Regions:
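Helix-loop-helix hairpin linking two adjacent transmembrane segments in secondary transporters
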Residues: 102-158
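Conserved MFS/SLC helix-loop-helix module at the cytosolic interface between two early adjacent transmembrane helices
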Residues: 23-61
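Cytoplasmic helix-loop-helix junction between adjacent transmembrane helices
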Residues: 67-106
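Helix-breaking motifs and short loop linkers at transmembrane-helix boundaries and internal kinks
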Residues: 3, 36, 57-63, 74, ...
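Structural signature of the two symmetry-related core transmembrane helices
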Residues: 39-54, 259-276
Length: 385
């Protein structure tokens, strides 16, 4: 069939995720602030369903990349819409727990995506496909079935009604110059908040990309010896971190302390600094514990920041800011962090110093995130009423 090389597969997956994240997150965020979010979510869901179906019938690597981009646009944009909708379906003091549901759904979807696709692929490989899938390679047939399942999952959205927008300072139809002025007025808070979360994403992405080479080179493990438990560790600690983040955000609001909603992010970022030393642990067990703590802390900060944006910003800024977070974190975190580790490794003596370079970069960016979140907490505005 297509028989793409590893480089081609990396390009397809990378472009499919990065291009939508960087180019479309902000425009979709603006639409979230100004248009009917339920209809927008349905449209984005249809887009990712169409992309999944086109993946099954793509005749070339170029069209396969385009199909994966459609999936990326739909899935990335729908997260922004879901967070905005979730904020208006509940009171501010409940948003930590409400956002937790969205994040758990996202984590479960990613896990099911791997598990269900693998199961369908195995099923179509071991047994004869039904007539309407006959002649398709197993991976293509699996994507046809995934598209059908996705279409069925969209049906409940047809019964969802657009909620009234809460905490509005300017009309959703206000000129963009007014929205820009509102953003500028909050720059002293949003700047460090953006910097803190981008630094967390850099640390998490670098760890995710380079933990496998560290386990192979420094501990002599083969991929089949660690792939399963690393994946389970990242998923499990991500879920635990999301739960802790949601609870801490709601508790922080009740504290009446300025920026109390961000206290959980400050604490998690501080714990993440020593946890970033995981590549230097003397044993695999020690590495796993430190990596799990780091992953959990990243999940805490991610959820706390999402809640803070929906509580401390007026409704007409939320989609734009969430979209900007996704775009900037995607560009810097996914595009820059792995490369920075390789450059530092080269300066320290080459590939043999990968673990040391990863630890150094992780500690530095984790430290930056701690101070950035602390500054954002001190500059946090009052919740919008």
């Amino acid at each position: 069939e297509l028989a793409p090389s590893d480089d081609a597969l990396a390009l397809i997956q990378g472009l499919g995720a990065a291009v939508p994240m960087v180019l479309f997150s902000i425009p979709i965020g603006i639409l979230v602030d100004r248009r009917n979010r339920v209809r927008l979510t349905i449209g984005l869901a249809l887009l990712w369903t169409l992309g999944t179906l086109l993946t099954a019938f793509a005749p070339s690597a170029g069209l396969l990349t385009a199909a994966r981009m459609l999936v990326g646009i739909g899935s990335t944009g729908s997260l922004t819409a879901a967070l905005s909708l979730c904020a208006d379906f509940c009171a501010p003091e409940q948003r930590g727990r409400a956002m937790l549901i969205v994040n758990l759904g996202k984590a479960l979807g990613v896990a099911l995506g791997f598990a269900l696709t693998g199961w369908l692929f195995g099923l179509l490989t071991d047994f004869s496909a039904p007539g309407w899938l006959a002649g398709l390679a197993p991976w293509r047939g699996a994507h046809v079935l995934l598209a059908a399942i996705s279409a069925l999952c969209l049906l409940p959205l047809l019964f969802l009604r657009e909620p009234e927008r809460r905490e509005v300072e300017a009309s959703p139809d206000a000129p963009f110059r007014i929205v820009a002025a509102e953003l500028w007025a909050r720059r002293s808070f949003l700047g460090p908040l953006f910097a803190g979360q981008v630094a967390v994403v850099m640390a998490d992405v670098a760890a995710t990309v380079w933990v496998a080479p560290v386990l192979s080179r420094d501990f002599g493990l083969q991929p089949q010896q660690f792939a399963g438990w690393v994946g389970a560790l990242m998923f499990g600690t991500g879920v635990v971190g999301a739960v802790l983040g949601g609870i801490s955000a709601d508790m922080g609001q009740k504290s009446r302390r300025r920026g109390g909603i961000l206290l959980g992010a400050v604490i998690a970022a501080g714990i993440g600094v020593p946890a970033a030393l995981f590549p230097l642990m003397p044993s695999v067990t020690g590495l796993a514990v430190a990596l799990g703590v780091m992953s959990m802390c990243g999940a805490v900060t991610g959820l706390v920041v999402s809640v803070a944006l929906t509580v401390l910003l007026p409704n007409e800024l939320r989609g734009l800011c969430i979209g900007a977070f996704i775009a900037i974190a995607g560009l810097i975190g996914f595009g820059l962090a792995p490369w920075v580790v390789t450059r530092v490794s080269a300066l320290m003596g080459g590939e043999a110093m990968l673990a040391e370079a990863l630890a150094l970069v992780g500690v530095i960016v984790s430290g930056l995130s701690f101070f950035a979140f602390l500054l954002a907490m001190r500059r946090a505005p009052e919740p919008v009423r």
